């Protein structure tokens, strides 16, 4: 009878160990893949991330928004010319240089909205270069590798049935939460790029207002917002680097449950800090 009970116990332990290892493998693979994809996605420019979407946004901006920007620019140019005339006592004290000043300002404004996409893409080219350099410096691996899982399996095989059942239930819960976390990370990273596309689609309007003294803050704030979105990628890379250091500090061979929940906590911390990167970048660059 004792032999039969022992065989049943060993069989249950084998099933639980196998189930735990499957849960852990799926859990860490999901997070490893998602975190590993962050550096790849963040390091791309809007034109290379989703070329089809970028071309659509560019066509919409040039065919729909650009004419509106042209109307706004025409209104501003006429308004500034009137203001210049009034400021010189209705041409009573006429000086020709202010006409050349007006022509120069209008020419610069026209060039700005004509080269809107070149300017906006230059911002993201600069930020991409910064992100790629940061990726070269941040060498820490965020992955939980196969040897770590093998060590965990050896530890699990030496445990009692009750402990294995507890770990199995907790690993199932952590697996579900990790999938949710991976989805959140995916939304944050891809949401940033969607926000970039939305900002770029309206680019001609703030560029049309850039040269006007009274309304120039709109154009300046827009440019700061573009740089904030670009350098948000750098802050995301910093978060991933911190996550890599924290993950490597976890020892899975001693207390598996504590280590498992610690990884869970670090992953939640990563998602939270990724949420904050946009606000931090805008705060530093004083963008609204």
Please describe what each predicted stretch is.
Residues 1-72, 87-97, 107-177, 216-221, ...:
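Gly/Ser-rich, low-complexity
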Residues 182-189, 193-196, 200-239:
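Extended serine/threonine-enriched, polar tracts that run as long, contiguous segments within proteins
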Residues 102-105:
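Elongated alpha-helical scaffolds
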Residues 75, 120, 127, 184-187, ...:
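Membrane-embedded alpha-helices of multi-pass transport/permease systems
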Residues 81-88, 210-215:
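Structural signal for the C-terminal ends of transmembrane alpha-helices
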Residues 67-79, 196-199:
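Hydrophobic alpha-helical transmembrane segments
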């Amino acid at each position: 009878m004792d032999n039969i009970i022992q065989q049943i116990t060993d069989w249950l332990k084998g099933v639980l160990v196998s189930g735990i290892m499957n849960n852990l493998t799926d859990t860490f693979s999901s997070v490893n893949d998602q975190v590993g994809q962050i550096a790849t996605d963040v390091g791309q420019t809007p034109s290379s991330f989703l070329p089809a979407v970028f071309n659509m946004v560019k066509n919409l901006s040039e065919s729909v928004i650009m004419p509106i920007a042209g109307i706004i620019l025409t209104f501003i140019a006429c308004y500034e010319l009137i203001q210049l005339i009034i400021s010189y006592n209705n041409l009573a004290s006429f000086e020709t240089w202010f006409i050349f000043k007006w022509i120069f300002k209008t020419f610069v404004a026209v060039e700005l909205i004509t080269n809107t996409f070149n300017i906006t893409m230059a911002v993201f080219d600069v930020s991409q270069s910064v992100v790629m350099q940061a990726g070269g410096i941040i060498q820490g691996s965020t992955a939980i590798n196969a040897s770590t899982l093998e060590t965990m399996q050896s530890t699990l095989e030496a445990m009692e049935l009750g402990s294995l059942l507890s770990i199995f239930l907790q690993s199932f819960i952590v697996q579900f939460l990790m999938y949710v976390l991976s989805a959140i990370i995916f939304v944050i990273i891809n949401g940033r790029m969607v926000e970039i596309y939305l900002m770029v689609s309206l680019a001609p309007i703030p560029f049309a207002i850039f040269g006007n003294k009274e309304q120039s803050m709109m154009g300046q704030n827009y440019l700061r917002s573009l740089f904030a979105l670009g350098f948000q990628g750098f802050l995301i890379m910093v978060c991933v680097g911190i996550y890599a250091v924290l993950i490597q500090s976890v020892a899975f061979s001693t207390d598996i449950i504590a280590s498992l929940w610690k990884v869970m906590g670090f992953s939640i911390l990563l998602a939270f800090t990724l949420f904050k990167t946009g606000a931090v970048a805008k705060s530093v660059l004083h963008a609204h």
